[in-house]
């Protein structure tokens, strides 16, 4: 299934705002409204993506709870989880670490004293996106298994 944004015609007025503002989280988004190749759409308020949930502020808890999210899928590495872990009472968490290829390569470049130019950055990002798919098939399969078995809204996130 390929997700594409709805066209820009007037009929695309959304019933909800895609960006959901929180004081501590800067990039919490509703993925509802995206259309698949066969014309079906992702339902609003059932699938969210976010940056670190560890930054959710106490004042944000009520708004977060109103969304009804009961499951989080945490794509962060073990080191990232240790640096900024979270515990939200109403949330069951599935940890599916996806190590970004670009991080390992950048560390190697720094160790070797190499500099990063625009062309190399573009190449690294392309390789990273390929590696996400090639190296993390089990994690993505588990991700979709969770999505298909949940009867409440789900949020997935990485560090950002």
Model features per residue range: what roles?
Residues 1-155:
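Cys-dependent protein tyrosine phosphatase-like superfamily
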Residues 159-160:
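Basic (Lys/Arg-enriched) interaction patch that binds polyanionic ligands
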């Amino acid at each position: 299934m390929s997700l594409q944004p709805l066209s820009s015609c007037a009929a695309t007025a959304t019933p909800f705002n895609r960006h959901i503002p929180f004081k501590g989280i800067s990039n919490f988004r509703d993925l509802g409204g995206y259309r698949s190749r066969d014309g079906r759409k992702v339902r609003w308020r059932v699938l969210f993506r976010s940056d670190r949930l560890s930054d959710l502020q106490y004042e944000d808890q009520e708004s977060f709870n109103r969304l009804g999210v009961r499951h989080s899928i945490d794509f962060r590495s073990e080191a990232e989880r240790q640096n900024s872990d979270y515990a939200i009472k109403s949330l069951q968490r599935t940890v599916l670490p996806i190590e970004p290829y670009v991080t390992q390569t950048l560390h190697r470049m720094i160790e070797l004293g190499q500099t990063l130019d625009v062309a190399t950055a573009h190449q690294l990002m392309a390789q990273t996106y390929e590696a996400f798919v090639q190296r993390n098939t089990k994690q993505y399969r588990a991700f979709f298994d969770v999505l298909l078995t949940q009867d409440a809204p789900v949020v997935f996130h990485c560090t950002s």
